[in-house]
Amino acid sequence: MASLISRPYPDSMNNNSGLAFIRLGDEEMKLLFGVSVKSIDPWSWPGGQSRLGKDLRKALHYPKYRYNTFSPFYYGIYDAKDICPFHELLSMIYQHPKYLTYTNLFVNSNYPSTKLLHQSLIRDHRKKIILIINNETSSQKLTELNAWTCEILLYPNNGPLLWQNDKFREQAIGKIVDAAKRYRNRLFLFSIGPLSRVLIHHAWLENPYNRYIDFGSTLDKMTKNRITRPYQSNAELNHDPSYLIKFDTNKRVFHVSSVD
């Protein structure tokens, strides 16, 4: 996955190919199945069907994803036993199993390698990155981020609640669709919670020739200058022994391996 995200400059900027990666975590799964949500971020959901949950389900059911090998659409998933049977989740996803990976691919014990990936992307794709983050980022931090991005799109941190509003939903989709339309062979980095999953869907539909990556909270220390999740200060806190990312400093590549 890391090698797909961080392809060499001549390849990534000249080929008519793209990539999308969305992650289905606890919050997304609960919205999908109408379960109440109490987020670490400043929003919650009392339970029952939400418009965002409905749109998440619609995106999962989109059959066109599986027929676009030139712009593969990857899902990060996990076995959410307390929310739904795993086979039920898999039956909702209209995608070939080879495009399914781990929702926690970038966090926990892999977070140190993810930070190296961030550094690599900023260095290799400077001023060719579109950053999609929450609007709580300070003006001083936005100035710093502007040094290596070509555009920053801001969304409210209570977006999942605002998604119930037709006008907000239309404007939110329109903003990302407009950006996807204006760029080609660029890197879009998303960190706006559950909205990322639906907005990546709309961006990919408009223009599959970009890379749309849901990095989630792994970007928080960089964009907010503070720790928002326990794993950011203790990467071993929730060690998942089923997979591991390692960064080869000599070859400057990432390797994903499975361990028992």
Segments the model singles out, each with a brief description of its role:
Residues 1-147:
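Electropositive, gly/pro-rich neighborhoods at or near active sites that engage anionic ligands
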Residues 148-186:
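A mid-sequence, solvent-exposed acidic-amphipathic segment
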Residues 22, 153-156, 215:
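Hydrophobic residues at beta-strand termini and immediately following loops
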Residues 82, 157-159, 219:
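Residue-level detector of flexible, active-site-proximal loop/helix-junction positions
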Residues 190-193:
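Glycine-rich beta-strand-to-loop/alpha-helix junction loops that act as flexible
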